[in-house]
Amino acid sequence: MMHFDPTVNAPSGRVHSIQSLGTVDGPGIRHVTFLQGCPLRCACCHNPDTWDTEGGTLYTPEALFAEASRCREYFGKAGGVTLSGGEPLLQAHFAAAYFSLCRDAGLHTCLDTSGCFLNEDAKALLSLTDRVLLDVKYPNEDDYRKHVGGSLQDTLAFLTHLNAQGIPTTLRTVIIPGLTDTAEHEAFLARLVGEHACIDKVECLPFKKLCTVKYEKMGIPFPLADTPTPDITSVKEMQSRISEFIR
């Protein structure tokens, strides 16, 4: 069987922004690239300026790898590179080519995604991914349709693939008062953690409203403008309870 090389005929990718030394998107200190374009419209989205699939700055996989390599001395044993967005699955071929270069250089690769679809390019990308940060947004299909514009079933199918491939996964969720701070959501996430051995970490992230200025600048309403931010202690306690189900 011929070895698939994602760097062959790889397209350029659209990059929204780069954080050279990030500390919240994967383990250790990381070079974090936020890719442009997203098919979802999450009510709590803090980067609406990444939605446009035609925006951003074009990079070849090699050019992005060169930028990340310059930060290597800061990564240590725990750090590496992360692709976020936007939704990096929209540019899976480019992302796979970039991760292939990183892997060949011994850099740890991390993918921050909603898991909104799983095609062959996405599977190729995952085969080059050392850790996935999977954002599970709501506990039922109705809320996914209403507040995300996507399908919970797509994310669950993605998680099933991660589990089958044994890809270390961090389960992430944003705690939004009145929407995801519920007993239903907590029980749902706890069940996912207990049923999927690939999940070895849980992160409950507090809903924030710092993005409001971005919506104002774009001339569009922020759907959760009147929603309060959560109590941080309660968020940490919820994370602790769900984490008890890690296998």
Predicted regions span which residues?
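Short glycine-enriched, charge-decorated loop/helix-capping segments at active-site entrances
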Residues: D49-T53, R145-S151, M218-T227
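Conserved AdoMet/S-adenosylmethionine-binding subsite of the radical SAM
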Residues: S69-E73, K77-G80, G85, L89-L210, ...
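Solvent-exposed alpha-helices and their adjacent loops that cap or buttress functional pockets
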Residues: V8, V24-G26, F75, L125
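Auxiliary Fe-S-binding modules of radical SAM enzymes
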Residues: M1-G22, P177-R247
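Short, conserved loop/turn and helix-capping segments at secondary-structure boundaries
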Residues: L58, G149-L152, T229-I232
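Canonical Radical SAM [4Fe-4S] cluster-binding loop centered on the CxxxCxxC motif
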Residues: P11, S17-Q19, T23-Y59
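Conserved alpha-helical substructure of the radical SAM core
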Residues: P48-V81
